Amino acid sequence: MRSSAPMPRMSRRGRVTIGVLVGVFVLFTLLGWGVQAWTDWLWFGKVDYTEVFSGVLVTRLLLFVTVGLAMAVVVGGNLWLAHRLRPRLRPQSPEQATLERYRMLLSPRLGTWFAVVSVVVGLFAGLSAQSRWSQWLLFRNGGDFGVKDPEFGIDIGFYVFDLPFWRYLLGVAFTAVVLALIGALAVHYVFGGVRLQGVGDRMSNAARAHLSALVAVFVLLKAVAYVLDRRTMLLEYNDGANVYGAGYADINALLPAKEILAYISVVVAIAVLVFSNAWMRNLVWPGISLALLGVSAVAIGGIYPWAVQTFEVKPSARDKEARYIERSIEATRAAFNLGGVETRRYAASNLQPPASLATDTAVVPNARLLDPQLVSETYTQLQQVRGFYDFGPKLDIDRYAVEGKTQDYVVGVREINYGELTAQQSNWINRHTVYTHGYGLVAAPANRVVCGGQPYFVSGFLGDRSQEGCAAPTDQIPASQPRIYYGERMEAGDYAIVGKSNPDANPAEFDRPVGEGDDGAESYYTYTGSGGVEIGSFSRRLLYAIKEQESNFLLSEAVNENSKLLYVRNPRERVEKVAPFLTVDGDPYPAVIDGRVTWIIDGYTTAATYPYAERINLQTETTDELTNRGTFQQARENINYIRNSVKATVDAYDGTVTLYEFDDGDPVLRAWNKAFGGDLIKSKTEIPAELSAHFRYPADLFKVQRNVLTRFHVTSPGDFYSGQDFWQVPNVPDAPDSGQKQPPYYLFTQFPGQEEARFQLTAAVTPNRRQNLAALMSGSYVDGKPQLEVLELPEDTRISGPVQVHQQMTNNAQIRQQLNLLSSNQAQVQYGNLLSLPFGDGMLYVEPVYVKSNQQQAYPLLQKVLLSYGDGGSFVVLADNLADGIKQLVEQGEKAGAPSTPPPSGETPAPTPTPTPTPSSPSVTPPPVTGELADAAQRVQAAIVELRAAQESGDFERYGRALKALDEATAAFEQAAGPGSAATPTGSPSPGG
């Protein structure tokens, strides 16, 4: 036989080069990990959450080492065993001659090759395992829910805490056995234990025993998988009923099939071992056994359940699936905390504006006119003071008690926007040591405007820029520490270096302007808070120079022995870092608590393995018009359990993070608290009263619950199966074709059935594929506990939904003409939140109308208010303010006569009188007029000319005066024309303005 030439070896230089490159890569990788770990340790120590850092780090290291080592031992051990069991003599054949070359290459360093393979496999297994730290901690620290699943009677805690980690371990075991089997088969083949050519046995006895044992272990693991699959079935989607959880075919066909397959797997595993080694000693019967398992899996686990589903369930699915739909309804409502929802019928039968609108003190006066998204520009322009200050794309809504009266306010913090620094201002020194913080919380009542449509600011003033009467004379929401070092506008690279070299040094941080205009005086400041990591030593400066890849940490004189580094300055990111087990709400909001500006962030505990509960995508369910335009987008996380378990606060000055327990009955939170020592989260009893007064129903939780309730408000299995009573969330009223969902909105108001006005998050829903109103939802806190309420309208209601109401109001001919007057080439009309307010056994709709000039530096001003009562289109007004609009609505109701009620279901409703909306501008050309009527017409013409001139000038104060003059002139003309006269002044502006 011709000897095989050995394969060529790599040159010494090549080996050295590869070794150096690998060494450099490993060195830099370890250096990066080390720097990140060290700086994280310093940061966690400063915020006093080292138990989180150490707990997560130790857990990840243990999982990495344990699973990685186990995988390496299993794979490497089987490689070694396969080589150890190699035959000493191999028959001569062309196949063996070819393999001899590989044996000659591998044999000198076979141990090294096995070690490399084992290390690589173990490394990947360890890296995968360390990412499962959260599953392990819940597995170790989880308890009972106190609720059992409806099929097996097992506590829900098993599914939430134990099952995910058992499934992961099973996956690791499968991977280890498969890799060991592949590796052992390869070694046996290379060293002659397995042959593809030649006569006699193709496999040595030792190789057969080894490989059959691995196959038997694989089949036994399959038996374990079938047992776990019986539990996992309660989490899977039921196509027959369009819900999650095992259905009729699953329980009556697939469930027993899984049990049978588990027993078959055990028998097959024994057969593989026996037939391969103790009896017959060939692969025929083991192969038949494995084929039997495959056929059984297809027939028993596939065809039989399919036949039951197709021929028994589908013809009568409504009845067959009813029991399992009911399970899903109950589990979903429990998992999403909907069990305590208060549902009340609301007839909304009054279709005419009642006189009580004019005397109401709970709903109408509290109607919010300021839209927190639109007036953000207004806040920025009027309260910015310097070009680098910013209020963000959306403001927040909170409530305060000022002078004994509680109402909602639109609030925002004046933050540094590093993107608006000029080229000179944005060098490293200025960006990180001078422009370090914002200043002040600015607030305005949500139901009041002044000075031509501006908010009435009551706090957060800087300089003397406010006009007389356009803002409160004194700060009504004072903050003793108004500086904002931590805010929503802060990004990853926006760190600040604070602290001066000695007490006599001049302050270096820009604090605030103290005079008017861009040329006014400026005051400077030195940070004195407890936050920030000390970086005075050379080692710390070197450490952070490497972390931030910035040499100025070492070279700049701005960094001194007293310097501190403030980083991770976004409140939401700080909470996510100290509590990585929480899902954080996308809309943090600021409040003045004990004189300090404090960020309040809602934290959620979630799970994805609650049996029979509906599974949703968190990102999809929380995305609406405001996502990424003032609210943060959630991750694409699939969940079927959520609780608002934590209220977190971040001090805007020193960055202190505090976690408060809010849902003391949540077993998931208890498990996490136990995992980190038991005192990570403060008790609910420790929440300060002043802080709890500013808690609000979380937006993302409300959106999830609202969307789940669109289906799961139906509690009858039969009705649920038909799907006819499902609801949907309407699109944005003024842009329905955008496909964006209408966001919920915060209001301080009183719904029917509530004893007094309260701060609540509200939303309207419509029937599926229809646009009339189906229900109103509200979320609020009553005595510190969350309360979700639903006002459900009759199915045959004539009340329009938000999209219809907006279209009916804006398409009204006379209102359309007035809106056209407001918009032109020089300005555009913008609509605020369309508020749906149940009142007087009917529906009141309020929609503020803003006008924004097309000129530079322009901002929206509230100019008009659209109001509608009843069905949404019969009683409509466009007024200068809310009080005037309510007055006009009441007058329309009085003219229409006695209130009407809808006829019983099935009867044809009588026609409802449709009063003409009160006009504010003329629309029809009259016959010639003389005398007093002619004088009035001339006044109207002059007012129209002035209105056009004001539009073109972009002067909103002048524009407001012109509108008022036009309204007065029109009223005088109508009075001169006499009752019933159809005469209107000539020269009306065209719809285009």
UniProtKB/Swiss-Prot annotation:
Residues 976-993 have a biased composition (Low complexity). Pfam families: UPF0182. InterPro entries: UPF0182 (IPR005372). Its main location: membrane. The keyword Transmembrane helix applies. Signal peptide: none annotated. The keyword Plastid does not apply. One of its GO terms (cellular component) is plasma membrane. This is UPF0182 protein Sare_4110. It comes from Salinispora arenicola (strain CNS-205).
